[in-house]
Amino acid sequence: MGETTEFQPVLISSEPVQLQALQPTLDAVHAHIGDVPALLDIAKDIGRTAPHPGEGSTGKLWELLASVTAVDVAAGRILEPHLDALHILAQAGHDQPAGAWGVFAAEGPGQKLEAKKDDDGGYVLEGDKPWCSLAAQLDGAVITAHLPGEEGRAAFAVDLKDPGVTCGEPAWTSRGLREIPSGPVHFNRVPATIIEGPGWYHQRPGFAWGGMGVAACWLGGAIALARDFAESLARSADKGRAADQIALAHLGDIDRTINSATASLARAAERIDAFEPDAFSSTWSGALRVRGTVAAAVERIQTLVSQNLGPGPLAFNEAYGKRTADLSLYVRQHHAMRDDAQLGSRALQGDREW
């Protein structure tokens, strides 16, 4: 299942012929599924030439993310934060760093990471940061930390190979994204370079753009599931078992769903590159719409494919089972009704397009 179509690029806004350049990358990703060091090397190679959002090729960036995730959801989960870290640094005017990078911006109860001034006027990080994916295998990360007093949080560039960095043992029992454990990291006076001042990390347009890039990854994983379903129907038809009306209706539903989600991403990419924020809608509201639209599409596709294919491939097909489990965890980065409530609150205050 999926052997003939899973490395096809995902089309968002390019012409199909333009996507052919992605094929060697997708083949390399497929050859190294489950091999995290190799996938990090691939991410580093991609990062040298990948476009930044907001510079005229946002749609191509999202096609890259979606296409890699369609081959392997975990590979997309590795690639996206590396590219996001490079984009964050570039947006602040910093040079592109060497090595594999991540972004650690989560907060957790009972865990606090503080940035303190050192004797030379720079910063050192002290404390703990939760949800640090692959920290032990990365070279560096963009990390948010609390500034002294009531200044809020700022983003810092940090060398994760510093001896003051201690990666905790992840209590990772997940069946999805098993090769990408997230766990706590302890920082003991680790030197850190401030990227920009307090509030910049969350207030910059790139924060919303990055959130939509994650949605492109989700959609890529769901499109791979849809391709699995379509292939299964085609194989059955070749054996004389034509799809019934329910299966065809569900495939049609999936087709419409993918088209709508793709159109939402394409429209957002076009706006980002044209620097045309709507007069009545903030950048973050736009991101909430896109992420919500794509997350709903992903969950719809997951439900329809699972109902039609039944338990067989979940139990006996490694690639399909892995994709399903990986995507189910990844899409939970969307906060469902809480994100919709945030969007609704903004809409009520006039931050809407209708």
Model-derived features with residue positions:
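A short core secondary-structure module
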Residues: 132-167
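Glycine-rich phosphate/cofactor-binding loops in nucleotide/flavin-utilizing enzymes
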Residues: 2-12, 311-354
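C-terminal helix-coil-helix/basic helical segment that borders enzyme active sites and/or dimer interfaces
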Residues: 27-30, 260-293, 303-315
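Generic structural signal for well-ordered, non-transmembrane alpha-helical segments
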Residues: 220, 252-259, 288, 292-299, ...
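Glycine-rich flavin
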Residues: 29-137
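Glycine-rich beta->alpha junctions and the first turn(s) of the following alpha-helix
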Residues: 174-259
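A generic local secondary-structure boundary/capping motif
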Residues: 112-115, 129-133, 142-147, 171-177
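A generic N-terminal leader/anchor concept
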Residues: 1-50
